[in-house]
Design a protein with these regions (language model features):
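Short glycine-enriched loops at secondary-structure junctions
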Residues: 55-60, 66, 152-154, 161-165, ...
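A short, glycine/Asx- and small/polar-enriched loop/turn
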Residues: 44-49, 163-164, 223-229
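Acidic-enriched catalytic cores of C-N bond-cleaving enzymes acting on peptides and small amides
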Residues: 181-225
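Acidic/His- and Gly-rich active-site-bordering loop/insert found
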Residues: 1-79
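Predominant activation on well-ordered alpha-helical scaffold segments within soluble catalytic domains
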Residues: 16-19, 88-96, 127-130, 168, ...
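Acidic/histidine-rich catalytic neighborhood of metal-dependent amide-processing enzymes
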Residues: 75, 80, 84-164
């Protein structure tokens, strides 16, 4: 599974692989939803809350990354194996063990391999499941509790989560030649001033609050006033 490329928004091949595994081990109502999440249910007795166990399919590595697996000692190494492909494998193993033992919890267990957790994916898969993008439909299951497997460490459970907002901002102008059109508004200058002001934001220590300007782009040449940034 580690050798299936799966950058955010391009997890289709890994999703198909996981769907096949869900079918093979015997999960019920196996499907891929409208945004690419893979879902399978192990039904409970109907006497308790439904719990979703989830792990994300995408990785931070772009297409073309060498995904050769190597072994050193008792460890395996491969881009994406830690975040989060190992967790998908663990989730499948849990489902397989429960089915093999015919073990049923009181409520349904919903196994989910969710898409677009990383970076610009902006939690798209989970937001869809819980209706945050206003596109969720009746295909999204009712969930009372959600457990995400996304850490190589053991011995603890994080029971609160950090909220996040991501913004893409574009500054535009008419552009021109840096000599002939000198003095017209320059989107790059405007962006620079905005970033400088953002850097002055005062945020609380508790709850921990952070911000970051991560990527900036703009301009076409050294003697051109950019039309956008």
């Amino acid at each position: 599974m580690c050798q299936i490329p799966a950058p955010s928004y391009k997890e289709e091949k890994k999703a198909e692989y996981i769907r096949e595994r869900f079918w093979e081990i015997g999960l019920r109502d196996v499907r891929i939803d409208a945004v690419g999440n893979v879902l399978g249910i192990w039904p409970g007795t109907g006497e308790g809350p439904s719990v979703m166990l989830a792990a994300h399919t995408d990785t931070v590595f772009p297409e073309g990354t060498d995904l050769t697996i190597r072994k050193e000692g008792n460890r395996y190494y491969c881009p994406g194996i830690n975040d989060d492909t190992h967790a998908v494998a663990e989730m499948i193993a849990v489902a397989k063990a429960m089915i093999h033992a015919d073990l049923h919890t009181k409520g349904d267990l919903i196994f989910c391999a969710n898409v677009c957790e990383e970076g610009l994916g902006d939690l798209r898969g989970v937001k869809y499941l819980f209706g945050y993008d206003n596109k969720a439909s009746e295909e999204c299951p009712e969930v009372d509790a959600f457990v995400s497997i996304d850490n190589q460490y053991t011995g603890g459970v994080i029971y609160t989560a950090t909220g996040s907002h991501r913004y893409e901002v574009t500054f535009t102008g008419r552009g021109g030649h840096s000599f002939q059109n000198f003095g017209i508004p320059n989107p790059i200058h405007a962006m620079g001033r905005a970033i400088a002001q953002i850097a002055e934001f005062q945020v609380p220590n508790e709850p921990k609050t952070t911000f970051n300007v991560g990527v900036i782009q703009g301009g076409t040449s050294v003697n051109t006033i950019s039309g956008s940034a």
